[in-house]
Structures are given as C-alpha cells and as structure tokens.
Amino acid sequence: MGLMWGLFSVIIASAAQLSLGYAASHLPPMTQFWDFIAAFFAFGPGARMLVVGLVGYLLSVFCWYKALHQLALSKAYALLSMSYVLVWIASMVLPGWEGTFSLKALLGVACIMSGLMLIFLPTTKQRY
C-alpha cells in the first residue's frame, strides 16, 4: 500500500511540475508584479495551470505523507527520482513542450532506473 501512495505522489508531482512549467511560460514574470497580479486575476490558462500545479503539489504531499507511514524512507525517497524521468518523457511527448532527446539525458534516465531497480529488488537474508 505504501508503494501505491508513493507512486501516486510521484505521478501527481510530475503533473504538477508540468502544470507549473506551463504557467511560468504563460504568465508575466514575478518581477513585473502588477502585470502578474492582473494576469492571475484574469484567470486565463496560465493562472488556471498555476492553481492546478499548486493544488497538485498539495495532493502529492498528502500522498507522500501516507507513503512514509507504510514504506521505508530509503525506498520512498528513491521513488521521487521517477518524477525526473516522467517529466523528461512528458516534455518530449506532449505538444508544445519542445523537450529534446539526448544520449546524455538517456544515460541519466538509465542510471535512475538502475538505481531504483537495485533499491527495490528483493533481498535474500544470509544466515551466518
């Protein structure tokens, strides 16, 4: 059950990250405070995605809290690295994100996946 909560947290956090990325590209920068406030209260697509992203992070924290009660911290924390993989893949697949493929990034994803496999593989207990 803890693994399920952890995976929910990763998926929701990844979607929230993509939502906030969309919002950042469609809202004025915070350095232009009044323009940002005006755009936010106009509640256009950028503002809606900002709210969706923030609510997503809140839901992700709830799932993370539940996961930590049922899963070892070493395993739960390792799951968070999956978010990097999901966001990278989504940025290449989703239209308008212009994510780029590179062998260096693929090598990083392979390292993340290898590490997760090592952490989550069942261990055999040795008797001495």
UniProtKB/Swiss-Prot annotation:
Membrane disposition: Multi-pass membrane protein
A GO molecular function held by the record: carbohydrate derivative transmembrane transporter activity
Subcellular locations according to the entry: Cell inner membrane
Summary of the function given for this chain in its UniProt record: Translocates 4-amino-4-deoxy-L-arabinose-phosphoundecaprenol (alpha-L-Ara4N-phosphoundecaprenol) from the cytoplasmic to the periplasmic side of the inner membrane.
Annotated family: Belongs to the ArnF family.
Superkingdom, natural source: Bacteria
InterPro entries (UniProt xref): Flippase_ArnF, Small_drug/metabolite_transptr
Protein name: Probable 4-amino-4-deoxy-L-arabinose-phosphoundecaprenol flippase subunit ArnF
Coiled-coil regions, chain positions: none
TM ranges: 1-21, 36-56, 77-97, 101-121
Primary residence: membrane
Keyword Transmembrane helix applies: yes
Pathway entry: Bacterial outer membrane biogenesis; lipopolysaccharide biosynthesis
Entry keywords, A to Z: Cell inner membrane, Cell membrane, Lipid A biosynthesis, Lipid biosynthesis, Lipid metabolism, Lipopolysaccharide biosynthesis, Membrane, Transmembrane, Transmembrane helix, Transport
GO CC terms, sorted: plasma membrane
Organism encoding this protein: Escherichia fergusonii (strain ATCC 35469 / DSM 13698 / CCUG 18766 / IAM 14443 / JCM 21226 / LMG 7866 / NBRC 102419 / NCTC 12128 / CDC 0568-73)
